[in-house]
């Protein structure tokens, strides 16, 4: 059977797809709240610095690794050294876990969008306790994502991203403009969100900014390696990486402009509780209900936007695992995608059930080592594994490939880097960025230990050990890692 190599048809398609992966639910509820609680505009400045110091360097390196290998993350590492393939296997396991709980949240956003359309946004009291509905809408959300995945890279992911990302941005800007013209309470909302407070900046605030920059950009989970494998040498990696980082940061900033003035105008008493998942699924529906007739329109537009952010993120997560199954087991794309989504859906069922009654406001019934399933999976992946995986990328590019060779290959497509940027990149990728990522990892471990969640740490590193064993047992000697099958970054005909 003849195989065909496919990828993104254009640079803008790649940028929008990667931005779609980076722009997720964390941008819309995590960044605004963290900004409001950690020094406002002062925190934003620190966050932007972290995007440059951690985000840009790591993302560029991961995209480069993918384009260099034209293959899945495991093969990308294996082509550098046969004993490094397990690092890529860890990068494939991470999104597999994230899909399982992210799809539950995606099901919520889908349900909220539909209920907003019918004028019933405040559904948390009934929806969260209806296990059947939770499972149903998780399935619907995964099906919506699968439709895009099954279309392939060019006709599925790229085409969808070219439509969905501009729509998401336009809706967000429209809601922000509306929020800023509400009148009373707007100034208070903006002050709550962005009032500079340098006295409130502590080392912990810096850690929060570093962590947010890291997680917001989809680093350390194989996505940028996978999407990078679908690009050619004609794509300017430096410019593309910069545009992805800028788009992601803009969305996060504008989200706060849309949310806090609205909350302050319609119910300022809710400002103090405007955080996390509760902000998205409890506070904002209450605000929309208080808007009267226009609230239905704003609510529908908002949750459609949130659903788009969730879908584009999950699509990228599924694609990482799907690409691996296609290339390593020679599966058809549709079959591989169905297997990945099916397994993740089965695992998502206990996650949805474990959340219990109004679990996004109250502590859910413990299911795994004293934590609900969603929190446990989130802590394992975001707090422990993602920094480890990103650290692998920096070490491999900085010390195995070397910055000089990496820069030469990045420039191979006629996209030269300025001399000063080459020098800065060499220092950053070898020393500064790995050190900062290590600080993020240590800070995360300390927070888990302080919270009594040592089981999270043990489970996460046990997964890494399992990936090492699995790689050396099943994949290391299977092939050289450089044959045509491994380097095929595309689909098998269906």
Segment roles from a protein language model:
Residues 2-6, 33-38, 68-90, 103-156, ...:
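Inter-helical loop and helix-membrane interface segments of multi-pass membrane transporters/permeases
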Residues 7-18, 43-46, 83-96, 137-141, ...:
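Select transmembrane alpha-helical segments in multipass membrane proteins
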Residues 84-90, 330-341, 380-441, 452-456, ...:
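C-terminal membrane-solvent junction of multi-pass transporters and transport-like membrane proteins
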Residues 99-121, 169-194, 261-265, 351-356, ...:
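Hydrophobic alpha-helical segments and their helix-loop junctions in multi-pass secondary transporters
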Residues 1-30, 58-63, 67-79, 85-86, ...:
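Membrane-interface "cap" regions at the ends of multi-pass membrane proteins
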Residues 34-38, 79-80, 86-90, 141-164, ...:
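Membrane-water interface regions at transmembrane-helix termini and the short interhelical loops
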Residues 2-8, 158, 162-311, 315, ...:
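Membrane-embedded translocation segments of transport machinery
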Residues 10-48, 225-228, 239-242, 246-249:
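Transmembrane helix-boundary motif of multi-pass solute transporters/channels
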């Amino acid at each position: 059977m003849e195989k065909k190599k496919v990828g993104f048809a254009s640079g803008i398609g790649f940028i929008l797809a990667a931005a779609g992966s980076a722009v997720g639910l964390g941008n819309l509820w995590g960044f605004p709240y963290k900004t409001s609680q950690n020094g406002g505009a002062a925190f934003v400045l620190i966050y932007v610095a972290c995007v440059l110091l951690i985000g840009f360097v790591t993302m560029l390196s991961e995209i480069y690794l993918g384009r260099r290998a034209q293959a899945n993350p495991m093969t990308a590492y294996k082509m550098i050294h046969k004993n490094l393939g397990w690092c890529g296997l860890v990068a494939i396991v991470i999104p597999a876990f994230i899909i399982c709980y992210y799809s539950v949240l995606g099901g919520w956003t889908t349900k909220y969008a539909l209920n907003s359309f019918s004028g019933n946004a405040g559904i948390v009291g009934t929806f969260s306790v209806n296990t059947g509905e939770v499972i149903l809408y998780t399935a619907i959300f995964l099906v919506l994502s699968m439709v895009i995945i099954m279309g392939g890279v060019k006709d599925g992911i790229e085409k969808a991203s070219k439509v969905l990302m501009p729509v998401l941005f336009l809706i967000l800007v429209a809601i922000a403009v509306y929020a800023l013209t509400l009148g009373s309470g707007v100034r208070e909302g903006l002050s709550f969100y962005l009032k500079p407070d340098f006295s409130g900046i502590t080392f912990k605030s810096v850690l929060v900014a570093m962590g947010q920059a890291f997680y917001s950009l989809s680093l350390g989970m194989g996505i940028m390696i996978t999407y990078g494998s679908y690009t050619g040498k004609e794509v300017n990696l430096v410019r593309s990486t910069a545009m992805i980082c800028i788009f992601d940061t803009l969305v996060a900033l504008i989200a706060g402009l849309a949310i806090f003035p609205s909350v302050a105008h319609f119910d300022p008493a809710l400002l103090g509780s405007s955080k996390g998942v509760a902000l998205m699924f409890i506070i904002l529906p209450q605000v929309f209900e208080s808007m009267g007739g226009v609230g239905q329109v704003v609510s529908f537009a908002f949750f459609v936007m949130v659903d788009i952010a969730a879908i584009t993120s999950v699509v990228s997560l599924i694609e990482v695992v799907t690409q691996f199954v296609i290339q390593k087991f020679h599966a058809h794309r549709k079959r591989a995608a169905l297997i990945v989504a099916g397994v993740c859906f089965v695992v998502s069922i206990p996650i949805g059930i474990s959340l219990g009654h109004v679990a996004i406001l109250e502590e859910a019934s413990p299911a795994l080592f004293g934590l609900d399933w969603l929190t446990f999976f989130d802590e394992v992946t975001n707090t422990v594994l993602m920094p480890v995986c990103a650290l692998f990328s920096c070490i491999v590019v900085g010390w195995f490939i070397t910055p000089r060779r990496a820069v030469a290959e990045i420039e191979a497509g006629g996209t030269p880097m300025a001399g000063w940027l080459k020098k800065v990149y060499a220092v950053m990728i070898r020393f500064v960025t790995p050190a900062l990522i290590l600080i993020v990892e240590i800070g995360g471990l300390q927070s888990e230990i302080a919270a009594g969640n040592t089981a999270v740490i043990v489970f996460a590193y046990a997964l890494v050990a399992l990936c090492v064993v699995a790689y050396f047992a099943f994949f290391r000697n299977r092939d050289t890692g450089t044959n045509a099958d491994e380097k095929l970054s595309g689909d098998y005909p269906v």
